[in-house]
Curated annotation (Swiss-Prot):
UniProt keywords, alphabetically: GTP-binding, Nucleotide-binding, Repeat, Ribosome biogenesis
Gene: der
Binding sites annotated in the UniProt record for GTP 1: 10-17, 57-61, 120-123
One Pfam match: KH_dom-like
Annotated protein name in UniProt: GTPase Der
Amino acid sequence: MTTPVVALVGRPNVGKSTLFNRLTRTRDALVADFPGLTRDRKYGQANIAGYDFIVIDTGGIDGTEEGVEEKMAEQSLLAIEEADVVLFLVDARAGLTSADIGIANYLRQRQNKITVVVANKTDGIDADSHCAEFYQLGLGEVEQIAASQGRGVSALMEQVLAPIAEKMNAESPEQSAVENTDVSETGEQDEWDHDFDFANEEDTALLDDAIAEELEAQDKNIKIAIVGRPNVGKSTLTNRILGEDRVVVYDLPGTTRDSIYIPMERDGQHYTIIDTAGVRKRGKVHLAVEKFSVIKTLQAIQDANVVLLTIDAREGVSDQDLSLLGFILNAGRSLVIVVNKWDGLNQDIKDQVKSELDRRLDFIDFARVHFISALHGSGVGNLFDSIQEAYACATQKMTTSMLTRILQMATDEHQPPMMGGRRIKLKYAHPGGYNPPIIVVHGNQMDKLPDSYKRYLSNYYRRSLKIIGSPIRLLFQEGNNPFAGKRNKLTPNQLRKRKRLMKFIKKSKR
């Protein structure tokens, strides 16, 4: 399912950056600045009311001086064109301006876009009277928020994203039926909360089996996204991969706009190459901006199983590479570092490049690094070994007994610290998901466990499970059953997963 894109549009100083920070902070998401595309474009990943989406701050637009279309930068236009939802921010305190009218005239021409007028800075004023004049813009209802305080933000995002989710569910009736299940009427939420005991060996065994069955049912086709800055050789690498030992290759336009999904087979394994550069016939490439779209890249990362981050050996690791890397890790995707254009460099320069990689990428020492020449093909074939290794590690089977045993060994070697005269106690661990591997650790005083000890546990699990090429996530829960007595509203994804697990557990208990 394609991740929805939300673009924030408006004149300067209406609170777009404040809303952007409010949205992305909900998941502590990386805010990626990509210099050189247009001035201060910002892209981030966010989650509101159970919906994952990409949010874009298009920067301030002044529609009064040279006309909206001329004043907008190319990337701002592209963001609006590729967005699923456009949030048009206006300042409730300042009132309607000629710049607002100019922007509204442009947006009104894009009738195929979901456009919502959002009146910001409504705190401390009579919001209804101040917002009345914005109805003249002719863009429908005016939503009221106070981005600096977060008031109305969650309700706004849930309102604008719900129609997109319904449209996607309509294309998948089975998923829609699951998401529309009334949890309170079926009573299954209570059964999951109160009857399932994580401390009970029989129940944890059933959970292990349910997760294993779900893992087994997953599509074994590995989706590979090739991402990187402009002119690092992404298209050359794609063509080189497709030209090497291929069996079935054809161009299939994907649901992610303008990205091309290319199925292929190699040594009996099915892959899908996601080319963010847009592999198409030469005659159809008209705009230089198609060479690199941040939006397409971020969506490809979300949709992939393994990401090949391509770096130009002659230019080294840039801040933009690190921004992309941060987004990959935040999305939990498996990673292979590809250093391209390795041919023709003398040994001194190669040593300098390797030294810089070690220095700037020391925080991702779990990822394999390959030095290749996409143009000449040297080293390209070896990429598939690392791709398969990373995917296998990200989807490997884990059991409660295995994870608890590793936890006990880790605490025996290095005990948790004392807090308030009491030692923090880690009781047991169980699998919480895969791709990336998620390990849920239960114990007492989890909120007081230092970050340094969490890193120690993460590294210990990585070494013990031999996880290469994939991030690993640890979740810390207080007590035996953190779900007992709680009736949290589940997200659509959680509803689908809970439905599958409960169905399996009920069948196993008969």
